[in-house]
Amino acid sequence: MPSDDSTLPQPVLLVEEGLELRQIELADAEEMFMVVDANRGHLREWLPWLDGTNSIEDEVSFIGTTLEEYGRGDGALYAIRLDGDLVGAMSLNWIDWGNRGCGVGYWLSTEHTGRGIATRCCVRLMEHCFDDLGLHRFVLEAATENFPSRAIAERLGMRLEAITKDREWLYDHYVDSALYAITEPEWRSRD
């Protein structure tokens, strides 16, 4: 659990004018499902959960689970909103308060990839994790062949720590994973 002087991620993290990370709510379920459904082919390439998200009810259930995790201090899920529209999601998939570490995950709709949105949102979430939550280590894990996500980690100055064999089952095959991390002192000393 968080210490008394830290708080879980705030409900809204302003990234820049018009771009924000907004804590997901049950009221977002329909919009989230519509974006997921419209981008199913694109997202399926790297995300293993698409076959379990086939209705708004599935999305409601997923959001309910993430809100429970948030309440326990175990994680957080944000809608990535650009000019008010939901264009993707970013999450703290896990928070280890004892070791002061966390892991990030994200996805964007097809038309919003390649514009630096995920990178800028990661920077804002890292700032919050290090500055406000007092975390020490920030982890990003991506399939070894997911070059766009790996490039984000590298742009952020994260260190490649491991390649893990057969890390994740992706519908009909295993994929290897690249594990990147950066510590708070490394983050502060970059550039």
Where are these regions (language model features)?
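Conserved GNAT-fold acetyl-CoA-binding loop/helix
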Residues: R44-G64
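Generic recognition of well-ordered alpha-helical segments
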Residues: S61, T65, R124-E127
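Residue-level detector of secondary-structure transition/capping positions
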Residues: D37-R40, D51, L67
